From Swiss-Prot:
It comes from the Eukaryota. It comes from Zygosaccharomyces rouxii (strain ATCC 2623 / CBS 732 / NBRC 1130 / NCYC 568 / NRRL Y-229). This is Outer spore wall protein 5. GO terms for biological process: sporulation resulting in formation of a cellular spore. Residues 70-122 are annotated as: Disordered. InterPro entries: Osw5 (IPR031430). The lineage of its organism: Eukaryota, Fungi, Dikarya, Ascomycota, Saccharomycotina.
Amino acid sequence: MATLSSVYFLIYFVSFLAIAAVASFFIIPLLGISFLFASAVVVFGFLSDITFKFAQSLYIKTDHRLKSTLSKMGNQKKGTNNSQAGNSPPPTPQPSVEPQLGPNANVWDAPGAETSTTSAIARSLEAREDVRVTN
């Protein structure tokens, strides 16, 4: 003969199992969806890092090529001016612009205003520890 406490135990145990089964119908699919979203975050983070590094290297190569081309153009222009220096009249002096400027015209204290061989974007990338900028 079963005592009253055994009957209560069976009622509580069966109700616990029923509630656990119903909860698992919700929890297990939600855990699966959460796992899929977490995996997507990791995959997209990896792809983002790869595309950033590719774009950064493409930018640095293009920036270097552009600076090299502009430097060659500048050297060519200087060479052309030097070869024609004896034949051409002296250049006329250009009017100065500074007297026409206002009182705050010479205020320009931007950080990184020193001359550099890299562009402003490449200089900002030099500050990152995980990025290596090469010329």
